[in-house]
Amino acid sequence: MSHSKVAVIGSGNIGTDLVVKLKKLATNVEIAVLVGIDPSSDGLARARRMGIGTVDTGVQGLIEHAEFDEIDIIFDSTSAKAHLVNEEALRTFGKRLIDLTPAAVGPYVVPAVNLDDHLGAPNVNMVTCGGQATIPIVAAISSVTAVHYAEIVASIASKSAGPGTRSNIDEFTQTTSAAIEKVGGAAHGKAIIVLNPAEPPLIMRDTVLALVTDPDQNRIRQSVIDMVEKVSAYVPGYRLKQEVQFTQLDDAESVATLTGGVDKGPGLWKVAVFLEVEGAAHYLPAYAGNLDIMTSAALQVAERIAANTVQEATR
């Protein structure tokens, strides 16, 4: 099967890790060009050593590149504001965009949950690292019972957070909160990110808290386990930290502002799921699971889009 050529915009932590994954793991797509704006960046230097084409003049340089016409899919790993500019510049060329920033121009995509619904979208958004880790769990719970409120806390090593991540904190919380509702299925969602300065750096940890009514604990527990297995198929370091926990709330009134005022009486429970994500250490060390889950999910999306394009063409 012929490979779809792809380009990556952004030569920072995420973009460089994605390039390494594309080179090592991809089966349906082929990395052609890495695009940056700093000629001396480590990412561009590494790409050149790997025999990959590079551009150091941003998206305009990509458009002018000799291989641009052959490129089918473009990953954008810059920042939310930069993606808006890049998307506008690329809009008329008919390229498929996979957005790894919180810009959310296109629909939110979490591969284990809703990728099949958006294989034909011109621009898909990968939400955030915290979203990729936790939204599958919210979706697993909401597939069993109504989730009145879901809150996620993503704790990442400070050393793994580059300038793009740091400049997008507000966008991170807004985009993740919205996707918890739209993709995860929660009635109300909230996201919190913590940059942990601990030394040595700790791997990514994620907590999912959900408020539900009279839960079938066995069904929820099994649904979560099944979802973890689905995610770990493309993010091998993704795992449950401990058993799913259930706590009955004695005073449901205290959470009425979170649940939108529903189910204030007895029967309200808190479901707690604790996760950790260890990176594959393709570019950064294993503690950077937050980068690994984003790039692994994005690679999964590109592989499926490319395969689907071939299937559609042969029908």
Swiss-Prot record:
Keywords: Aromatic hydrocarbons catabolism, NAD, Oxidoreductase, Plasmid. Pfam families: AcetDehyd-dimer, Semialdhyde_dh. The keyword Ubl conjugation does not apply. NAD(+) binds at residues 11-14, 160-168, 290. InterPro entries: Acetaldehyde_dehydrogenase, Acetylaldehyde_DH_C, NAD(P)-bd_dom_sf, Semialdehyde_DH_NAD-bd. GO terms for biological process: catabolic process. The active site is at 129 (acyl-thioester intermediate). The keyword Oxidoreductase applies. Its EC number is 1.2.1.10. It catalyses: acetaldehyde + NAD(+) + CoA = acetyl-CoA + NADH + H(+). One of its GO terms (molecular function) is NAD binding. Signal peptide: none annotated. Belongs to the acetaldehyde dehydrogenase family. NCBIfam families: ac_ald_DH_ac, PRK08300.1. This is Acetaldehyde dehydrogenase 2. The lineage of its organism: Bacteria, Bacillati, Actinomycetota, Actinomycetes, Mycobacteriales.
